[in-house]
């Protein structure tokens, strides 16, 4: 019997005239780099994921590395990642000079082996990176149980690590935008979560990503650390910073959520203490370079796509669910094991 083969393209982006129009408006607005559309998208993502803050960046890779910089992870530290993941999950650890520790998967499962995770933790372990593969949220209850059990081994090296008080859980949610488990969205479960908006994802800005965090102390005020060797130019008093962030000035009354957002802006804009939008305000053109950091911000053209995708996202997820149900039905009698995207306590993002 002759069968006609049909080409099914791999995850083409779902774009409409709405996205095209929003991008056109962004281009003609005269504001195409990080600006009002990017800030609006950050607010919408925070509301959608129930997180304190969102920082939009150029990739999930940038977001994952940003977490390590915020935590001060570097040489002498260890970061645990699952062996079954994309290269970026592992490569960002190499970028900061920390030691990469890989944990194998469970048998017949895409999640990491949590017993092996517990065995892999040492006094040098600073971060565990669970991966929500295929948009299915990991068993974070088990992950947090393990890091709490190993709390006595934790040795913090900056103020943020000390405030968290245990090994940090930094989720790779590249596939999991819109997924949930036990009533909580990916993004409000782990301490930090990194999302991808790459062209093949079910929510896309062509290239792009986002970093979110969910910390119980986010609204608490940050305590400063005096640096006696440095004096303020005008007051002559000791310059104050935050432990682990040498050279970054302390801001009176700043909360942890505000500090982490400010640090993320610095780390993603060459250490520039004002973004392009802030510099447009009257008399605010002058800025300082605080440190030699990176360039990985999102642009308003990318954010324009994201704003329309956010509006359409419930329909995009519903359509993917229909397609998955058709695959599940077609494969059920063929002895083919498929991922369980839906259950009593979880809903995947079908990424």
Feature-to-residue mapping (PLM):
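Conserved PLP-binding active-site segment in aminotransferase class I/II-type PLP enzymes
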Residues: 1-70, 74, 143-144, 255
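Short glycine- and hydrophobic/aromatic-rich loop-to-beta-strand nucleating segment
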Residues: 194-195, 204, 209-212, 303-305
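Glycine-biased, low-complexity coil/linker segments
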Residues: 231-234
């Amino acid at each position: 019997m002759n069968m006609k083969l049909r080409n099914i393209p791999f995850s083409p982006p779902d774009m409409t005239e709405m996205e095209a129009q929003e991008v056109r408006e962004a281009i003609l607005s005269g504001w195409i780099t990080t600006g009002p559309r990017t800030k609006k998208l950050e607010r919408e993502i925070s509301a959608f994921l129930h997180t304190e803050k969102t920082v939009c960046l150029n990739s999930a890779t940038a977001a994952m590395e940003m977490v390590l910089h915020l935590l001060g992870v570097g040489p002498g530290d260890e970061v645990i990642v699952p062996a079954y993941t994309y290269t970026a999950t592992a490569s960002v650890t190499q970028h900061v000079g920390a030691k990469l520790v890989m944990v194998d998967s469970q048998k017949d499962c895409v999640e990491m082996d949590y017993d092996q995770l517990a065995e892999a933790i040492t006094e040098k372990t600073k971060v565990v990176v669970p991966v929500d593969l295929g948009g299915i949220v990991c068993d974070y209850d088990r992950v947090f149980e393990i890091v709490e059990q190993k709390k006595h081994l934790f040795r913090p090296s900056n103020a943020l690590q000390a405030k968290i008080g245990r090994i940090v859980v930094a989720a790779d949610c590249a596939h999991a935008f819109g997924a949930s488990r036990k009533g909580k969205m990916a993004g409000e479960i782990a301490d930090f979560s990194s999302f991808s908006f790459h062209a093949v994802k079910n929510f896309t800005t062509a290239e792009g990503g986002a970093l979110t965090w969910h910390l119980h102390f986010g609204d608490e005020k940050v305590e400063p650390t005096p640096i006696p060797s440095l004096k303020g130019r005008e007051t002559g008093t000791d310059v104050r910073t935050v432990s682990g962030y040498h050279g970054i000035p302390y801001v009176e009354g700043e909360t942890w959520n505000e500090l982490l957002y400010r640090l993320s802006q610095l780390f993603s804009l060459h250490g520039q203490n004002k973004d392009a939008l802030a510099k447009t305000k009257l008399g605010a053109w002058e800025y300082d370079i605080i440190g030699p950091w990176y360039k990985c911000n999102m642009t308003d053209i990318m954010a324009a796509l994201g704003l329309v995708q956010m509006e359409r996202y419930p329909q995009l997820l519903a359509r993917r669910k229909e397609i998955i149900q058709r695959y599940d039905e077609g494969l059920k009698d063929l002895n083919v094991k498929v991922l369980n995207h839906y259950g009593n306590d979880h809903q995947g993002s079908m990424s």
